[in-house]
């Protein structure tokens, strides 16, 4: 018969090994929570960001101001009446060189973050429930669809570059899905008896309230625009890929708020994904008033960003023994 204490102890070591450096495993100190003041917390988070994430984070405020300025400057821009989703998405995504650079930067930052997540996953394969299987499955499917779409855009400006990045994303996501499904299956079954002792189960009311408010706003906008959106044609792969990634992120945010435990870690990787999503969504802002699709996508990105911020917050906090 398995010793419950030994199993729980091993589980705690696995969790701590995932969140800490390999060197800390030799000492195995007691779990503590990051409970400093707000200024110290922000400073601690900033130090844990990768260099690319810091550059992206610093760029967000001026870029947001720039795109909001473009929104007001072009408020009399003609409304987009085209019914083809692919044409609409191309029109509202920003087509000048600066927009392309911003989108490419978001892809690169996100990719570097995903590599962080993948490397940590491979190092600590036995960390049960640290990575959400449903999230990884949905994101992988979305990545595959994005890659297929990128091949249809090779003739466009920057098409080859974005295609290469999409392929790299797809490969790393498939690898992570394999690690999540194949390697963790046996360990999950072995350690299932310790789930309530080692996984967070305390609901975080502020996080849940923020998540619920933003998701409610998103669904309100989607329902409000549903009639116009239904008149659009084509773009099935594009919207399916977006919805899969949105559902994955929103679910991770809900799970983190309900359990006070992240569904996507480490913080360095999760925060990079948040920054990448924000940067990628910014070029849509100037077209908020000219297309229902811009409003739909931006509201969706809002829910994704808030959900991932909630997840990243709990990924930053050191897990505690419950």
UniProtKB/Swiss-Prot annotation:
Superkingdom of this protein's organism: Eukaryota
Protein keywords: Membrane, Transmembrane, Transmembrane helix
Coiled-coil stretches noted in the UniProt entry, renumbered to this chain: none
Membrane-spanning intervals of the chain: 159-179, 203-223, 234-254, 267-287, 296-316
GO CC term (a single one): membrane
Cell compartment(s), UniProt: Membrane
Membrane topology designation: Multi-pass membrane protein
Protein name: Uncharacterized transmembrane protein DDB_G0287441
Source organism per UniProt: Dictyostelium discoideum
Lineage: Eukaryota, Amoebozoa, Evosea, Eumycetozoa, Dictyostelia
């Amino acid at each position: 018969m398995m010793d419950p204490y030994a199993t729980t102890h091993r589980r705690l070591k696995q969790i701590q090994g995932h969140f800490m450096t390999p060197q800390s495993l030799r000492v195995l100190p007691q779990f503590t929570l990051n409970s400093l003041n707000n200024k110290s917390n922000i400073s601690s988070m900033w130090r844990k960001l990768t260099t690319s994430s810091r550059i992206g984070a610093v760029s967000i405020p001026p870029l947001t101001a720039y795109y909001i300025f473009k929104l007001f400057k072009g408020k009399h821009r003609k409304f987009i009446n085209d019914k083809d989703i692919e044409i609409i998405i191309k029109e509202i995504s920003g087509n000048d060189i600066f927009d392309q650079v911003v989108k490419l930067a978001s892809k690169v930052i996100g990719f570097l973050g995903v590599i962080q997540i993948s490397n940590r996953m491979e190092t600590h394969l036995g960390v049960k429930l640290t990575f959400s299987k449903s999230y990884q499955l949905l994101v992988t499917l979305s990545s595959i669809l994005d890659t297929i779409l990128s091949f249809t855009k090779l003739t466009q400006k920057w098409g080859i570059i974005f295609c290469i990045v999409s392929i790299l994303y797809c490969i790393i996501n498939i690898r992570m899905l394999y690690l999540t499904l194949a390697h963790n299956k046996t360990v999950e079954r072995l350690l299932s008896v310790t789930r309530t002792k080692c996984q967070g189960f305390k609901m975080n009311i502020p996080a849940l309230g923020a998540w619920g408010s933003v998701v409610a706003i998103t669904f309100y906008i989607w329902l409000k625009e549903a009639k116009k959106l239904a008149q659009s044609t084509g773009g099935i792969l594009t919207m399916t890929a977006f919805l899969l990634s949105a559902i994955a992120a929103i679910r991770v945010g809900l799970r983190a708020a309900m359990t006070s435990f992240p569904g996507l870690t480490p913080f360095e990787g999760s925060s990079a994904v948040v920054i990448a999503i924000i940067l990628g969504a910014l070029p849509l802002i100037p077209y908020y008033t000219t297309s229902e699709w811009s409003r739909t996508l931006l509201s969706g990105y809002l829910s994704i960003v808030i959900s991932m911020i909630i997840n990243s917050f709990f990924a930053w906090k050191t897990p505690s023994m419950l």
